[in-house]
Amino acid sequence: MAALVEPLGLERDVSRAVELLERLQRSGELPPQKLQALQRVLQSRFCSAIREVYEQLYDTLDITGSAEVRAHATAKATVAAFTASEGHAHPRVVELPKTDEGLGFNIMGGKEQNSPIYISRVIPGGVADRHGGLKRGDQLLSVNGVSVEGEHHEKAVELLKAAQGSVKLVVRYTPRVLEEMEARFEKMRSARRRQQHHSYTSLESRG
């Protein structure tokens, strides 16, 4: 039986670190420029994004061992998530309640289509729209700690349907890739329509 995982308090720890930096600045013991630079980093959106992804992975990774082993594995997984997003927006964690009305968004893409899985539509007035945080063009990286990168479309659908109470999504915003993918799909649909029209015309001429 797996040991209970003690919840993290990283947000509290960051706040304490900022308070300590403010005290050190008042004391004049260290150069204020360096302390202010470190304080800006700790209070930045980037640091918040790292903390959110780390906490999400820490809570959901299936790892046995000491707290140190778990922390090390979570750190590696967090670095991997941000490395994979290099050149794109950084990963974000979006948590939505799971209700009878659904989650309020559509996804497209998957391994069978040789593309990542994307949020193709946020339904106006739906759960995702009301809670905010999720955008059309977000690439879906994981669902409740389970990676969907390189997975089939149906795998993501199953994970979203199986979620109970709430669902935690790790996403990153890359709208250009979604636009390219939609343009590719539209070309494929147009080619199929032309082929069907050609077949229909050929049958008519034979008649």
Swiss-Prot record:
A motif (Kinase interacting site) lies at residues 1-13. InterPro entries: L27_C, L27_dom, L27_dom_sf, LIN7, MAM_complex_regulator, PDZ, PDZ_sf. GO terms for biological process: exocytosis; neurotransmitter secretion; protein transport. One of its GO terms (molecular function) is protein domain specific binding. Residues 198-207 have a biased composition (Polar residues). GO terms for cellular component: basolateral plasma membrane; bicellular tight junction; plasma membrane; postsynaptic density membrane; presynapse; transport vesicle membrane. It is a peripheral membrane protein. Residues 93-175 form the PDZ domain. Keywords: Cell junction, Cell membrane, Exocytosis, Membrane, Postsynaptic cell membrane, Protein transport, Synapse, Tight junction, Transport. Residues 187-207 are annotated as: Disordered. It is found in: Cell membrane; Basolateral cell membrane; Cell junction; Postsynaptic density membrane. Residues 10-65 form the L27 domain. Expressed in the kidney; predominantly in the vasa recta. Gene3D superfamilies: 2.30.42.10, L27 domain. The kinase interacting site is required for proper delivery of ERBB2 to the basolateral membrane. The PDZ domain regulates endocytosis and recycling of the receptor at the membrane. Plays a role in establishing and maintaining the asymmetric distribution of channels and receptors at the plasma membrane of polarized cells. Forms membrane-associated multiprotein complexes that may regulate delivery and recycling of proteins to the correct membrane domains. The tripartite complex composed of LIN7 (LIN7A, LIN7B or LIN7C), CASK and APBA1 associates with the motor protein KIF17 to transport vesicles containing N-methyl-D-aspartate (NMDA) receptor subunit NR2B along microtubules. Forms a complex with CASK and CASKIN1. Component of the brain-specific heterotrimeric complex (LIN-10-LIN-2-LIN-7 complex) composed of at least APBA1, CASK, and LIN7, which associates with the motor protein KIF17 to transport vesicles along microtubules. Forms a heterotrimeric complex composed of MMP5, LIN7B and PATJ; the N-terminal L27 domain of PALS1 interacts with the L27 domain of PATJ and the C-terminal L27 domain of PALS1 interacts with the L27 domain of LIN7B. Forms a heterotrimeric complex with DLG1 and CASK via their L27 domains. Belongs to the lin-7 family. This is Protein lin-7 homolog B. It comes from Mus musculus (Mouse).
